[in-house]
């Protein structure tokens, strides 16, 4: 239930209260939510919720119901309840409530079987979000650090695709083990187009999670390869922290968050190779026939892409301007109208659930203008809209009719260290003004992408455009 509806309920209660006792036998009994609702196994008035965490709830009594605001998500049987309302149809509902890291108050509207309502306010304090910037930074530091102690430094650098590269193979095995350890059916997909098995055209890590509906498929991914030595525009990199170790680690954290959830469609979480060589990794997955490739007999509904993460709002540049934040849905066939339903999810997540500043601008112009709406938002911090912008693996799936979201941090003139030896974790920290600032920036974009996926999964209007 949104805040306006909650306020309406409260207003009604205040208006009715002075009339109590005036109607004799018609007087209704008082509502006691604690008789039917528990949060974390205690009465609501004794509960304390934490930001960014799941909390168990129990709702008893046929016909009783609860509803929540947009930034308090309801899950039943591991599945998101999109209308934010659940009613007891039998005896008891067991579920979970998920706050965001930015939830400042928890208001639950309780309604009994007779239609009487009561507003329940639950205190909230700082928590450890299920996906968080600190975990992201720790894993980034482990992957990109090189030392003699393998418990402290993974040393998964030099992940160049193309010629035989033991460093890339070693990193792929590490990533595969992460997904397998979380219970995903995980495969390494090698595709060889030129006859030399020692030089695969692509080598992807594909993790599968079965959905309830066997007729559809959806996915999320980011590329794990980095720009090779001599690559344009900056001469290549050995660490590739921004492009795209950052997106790779976000996928590892999403896998952990999704492990106990139930999705409608079969779901793939992927780490692509050969993105820097022309999207060859995602194309190999989408266009080849194998047991763990993209199924050709199922409807591909949507795909979300993570590429170059962290250098974005709420982080600030050294000149005092916020870094631009880019998130584009697509395809955008007609710039004058909304073309795809996933755009509504994109907008709702950023501005209704996560409460990002829609109209924040800078004096002047940002330095990158590659999308078809650039003239409309050259100075807008939250560049969140429908667009055809490409340059990454979402294009592979958009070309197959899927609705897509592409998350991308600052690029070109706004942050030009990618594809260069300067693309390091230390440089990212320095550019945003500190580790905490980088963690906060990553936490926001990871929550945006995670919620987009969860909500899109339960949005039937999101269909393949060729269906």
Model-predicted segments: where are they?
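Metal-dependent peptidase/peptidase-like ectodomains
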Residues: 272-404
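A non-catalytic alpha/beta surface segment that caps or lines the substrate-entry region
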Residues: 85, 145, 149-210
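N-terminal capping segment at the start of a domain
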Residues: 122-169, 414-426
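Active-site-adjacent mobile loop/cap segments within catalytic or ligand-binding domains
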Residues: 125, 305, 309-327, 370-467
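Surface-exposed, short loops/turns at beta-strand junctions within beta-sandwich domains
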Residues: 95-104
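Short, compositionally biased P/S/T/A/G/V-rich stretches that sit at domain boundaries
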Residues: 25-56
